[in-house]
From Swiss-Prot:
HAMAP family reported for this sequence: AIRS
Organism name: Lactococcus lactis subsp. lactis (strain IL1403) (Streptococcus lactis)
Protein name: Phosphoribosylformylglycinamidine cyclo-ligase
One Pfam family hit: AIRS_C
SUPFAM superfamilies named in the record: PurM C-terminal domain-like, PurM N-terminal domain-like
Main localization of the protein described in the UniProt heading: cytoplasm
GO CC list: cytosol
EC number: 6.3.3.1
InterPro entries in the record: PurM-like_C_dom (IPR010918), PurM-like_C_sf (IPR036676), PurM-like_N (IPR016188), PurM-like_N_sf (IPR036921), PurM_cligase (IPR004733)
Catalysed conversion reaction: 2-formamido-N(1)-(5-O-phospho-beta-D-ribosyl)acetamidine + ATP = 5-amino-1-(5-phospho-beta-D-ribosyl)imidazole + ADP + phosphate + H(+)
Length: 338
């Protein structure tokens, strides 16, 4: 096989080396206690023995960013989509009570463009910094024929640790009378984008809407909020009984994941500010108001269940909204009261 045969097939090995060189400085920023070795090994290593955890339980999560990625590609804006990828993973594991330890990413692309991929990984590193996780490894696969040259996909994998006695088990601990606090989202986050793209398919994404204070594309690409640093201290103080990350499926699919079958979450509409982008989606997409709660976070990215006696103090600490309470099971697991 000739020297340039691989390049002729569409795989640029030298560009791959350049990507690794470019991303090292971003990865280095995320280093934390426990990381062993440097980027470039066959596997990332982490020393659990340095952690002050008596009965460690490892909790892992993996996710991508869905078709929000298509908007980033369309806008040629790649510096924040990595934050979304980290957020989707670490917000899931913090819901189980885990402190994120490390993260790995996977990028598949049709053509290895070092400048673009550096932006993507810089976003991943920023997400890791926000979560307190180390970026200890990853994979960039150049796959001509599988993807168009400008296209790429992004996924990630997070591992966290929890003290066994501090695991969040809402099915066991959440009870009727508990107060539900909602933590504000930064926007749509990373779910429902196939519908979002359809609703706004005929709009100029560089323009704004009467409902928005910035361009539509900037609104749609606002990175997912990471809730780790807000929630972790309270988890360690045993102040939280249940956590629901409001992702795909909105309130109706995600709230029931944090309590048992004998309970319902009673949500009071109007107890928080629904973000303008959701009002725009409902209006321009002709989506039934009730269905919005089955798809989107509606301005609440995370819901926690707390004991009534702790609710007021935690509401202030978290700058949260009191959005409802737990009640004995009614007709459905989630009831939206107007």
């Amino acid at each position: 096989m000739s020297e340039n045969a691989y390049a002729k097939s569409g795989v640029d090995v030298e560009a791959g080396y350049e990507v690794v060189s470019r991303i090292k400085k971003h990865v280095a920023k995320t280093e934390r206690l426990g990381v062993l070795g440097a980027l470039g090994g066959f596997g990332g290593s982490f020393d659990l023995s340095v952690l002050d955890v008596k009965e460690p339980v490892l909790i892992s999560g993996t996710d991508g960013v869905g078709t929000k990625l298509m908007l980033a590609i369309q806008a040629d804006k790649h510096d924040t989509i990595g934050i979304d990828c980290v957020a989707m993973c670490v917000n899931d594991i913090i819901a189980a009570g885990a402190e994120p330890l490390y993260f790995l990413d996977y990028i598949a692309t049709g053509k290895n463009i070092p400048e673009k991929l550096e932006q993507v990984v810089a976003g991943v590193a920023e997400g890791c910094l926000q979560a307190g996780a180390a970026l200890i490894g990853g994979e960039t696969a150049e796959m001509p024929g599988m993807y168009d040259e400008d296209d790429y996909d992004l996924a990630g994998f997070a591992v966290g640790v929890a003290e066994k006695s501090q695991l969040i088990d809402g099915e066991k601990d959440v009870e009727a009378g508990d107060v539900l606090l909602g933590l504000a989202s930064s926007g749509i986050h990373s779910n429902g984008y196939s519908l979002v793209r359809k609703v706004f398919s005929d709009f100029d994404l560089n323009e704004s809407l009467p409902e928005l204070d910035q361009s539509l594309i900037d609104t749609l690409l606002t990175p997912t909020k990471i809730y780790v640093k807000e929630l972790l201290p309270l988890i360690k103080q045993n102040k939280i009984k249940g956590i629901a990350h409001i992702t795909g499926g909105g309130f109706h699919e995600n709230l029931p994941r944090m309590f048992g079958n004998s309970l319902s979450a009673e949500i009071v509409e109007g107890s928080w500010n629904i973000l303008p982008i959701f009002k725009a989606l409902e209006k321009y997409g002709d989506i039934k108001h009730e269905e919005m709660y089955e798809i989107f976070n509606m301005g609440i990215g995370m819901v926690i269940a707390v004991a009534p006696e702790n609710a007021e103090a935690l509401k202030k600490v978290l700058n949260a909204f009191e959005i409802g309470k737990m009640v004995k099971r009614q007709d459905s697991a989630v009831v939206i009261k107007k």
